[in-house]
């Protein structure tokens, strides 16, 4: 029995020397130490020994078992370490290689032009004000002197949510909300998203506006012209021609359309300006006293002006964009130009 155990240990040690993987090592462990392994079979034969031999052989069996477990565990550790070393060798990182650059986006042209316009008016003393896009009829129409039968209230022009709630058609409601919150003087611009039922090459059902308001004592139409001329000269160049044409808006009186000399032909006449030499960019006027009545301002003591422009139109003129829909299509070939 002693010789058999020594032979078993020698055979297991010899096989262990050729084991290179964890799977083959596990097979060897099962072969010798498993429930049906060779050492287990020897242990089952202890019962046939005499009472004098059994304790002695039992000690030898335990010693062989312990030795086998120790050698197998050592081999397992060696195999794992060898695997780690191979993985480190095959997967090593060359720190001298250039890094992988992540694609970096650019700011959208609408964002760029909005920030530029806001910066210009900030330099003229205007603050930025904001308001909700889902608006009440009172702020969007009634307080701005839109009669009940005004065409702008028609479903063809306005997205109504209910009888009194709608998607704002301009950012002028922000002006009303501001005047209701604070007394004069007021000097704000209100950039934001607006909605109208319209869609073609020059119109979108969702677009952006910046509207402005200035209310104080002694404000005149000359102040309006001076502010807007200063703004236009900063945005399009100091030599840009400016003209004002009479117009009509429910919430201003008198009202005007503001044109600039065509940025394409410099006022000489071309297809873009329809050979007039001028391009319309915004509407403006003196705040109608009826608006002051809705916000509890004293129309006898205070005057003011308001103006509004479509940001997409300004962007198209500033950057030479021919189709407004390009601003909403998220085409990287287009957006990467800014």
UniProtKB/Swiss-Prot annotation:
One matching Pfam family: Phe_tRNA-synt_N
Free-text cofactor note: Binds 2 magnesium ions per tetramer.
Xref: PROSITE patterns: AA_TRNA_LIGASE_II (PS50862)
EC numbers for this chain: 6.1.1.20
Primary localisation category: cytoplasm
UniProt-listed CDD domains: PheRS_alpha_core
Binding annotation for Mg(2+): 253
A GO term from the CC aspect: cytoplasm
GO biological process terms held by the UniProt record: phenylalanyl-tRNA aminoacylation
Catalytically driven reaction(s): tRNA(Phe) + L-phenylalanine + ATP = L-phenylalanyl-tRNA(Phe) + AMP + diphosphate + H(+)
Cofactor(s) needed for function: Mg(2+)
Keyword Cytoplasm in record: yes
Cell compartments where the protein resides: Cytoplasm
GO molecular function: ATP binding; magnesium ion binding; phenylalanine-tRNA ligase activity; tRNA binding
Keywords: Aminoacyl-tRNA synthetase, ATP-binding, Cytoplasm, Ligase, Magnesium, Metal-binding, Nucleotide-binding, Protein biosynthesis
Subunit field text: Tetramer of two alpha and two beta subunits.
Protein family membership: Belongs to the class-II aminoacyl-tRNA synthetase family. Phe-tRNA synthetase alpha subunit type 1 subfamily.
Protein known as: Phenylalanine--tRNA ligase alpha subunit
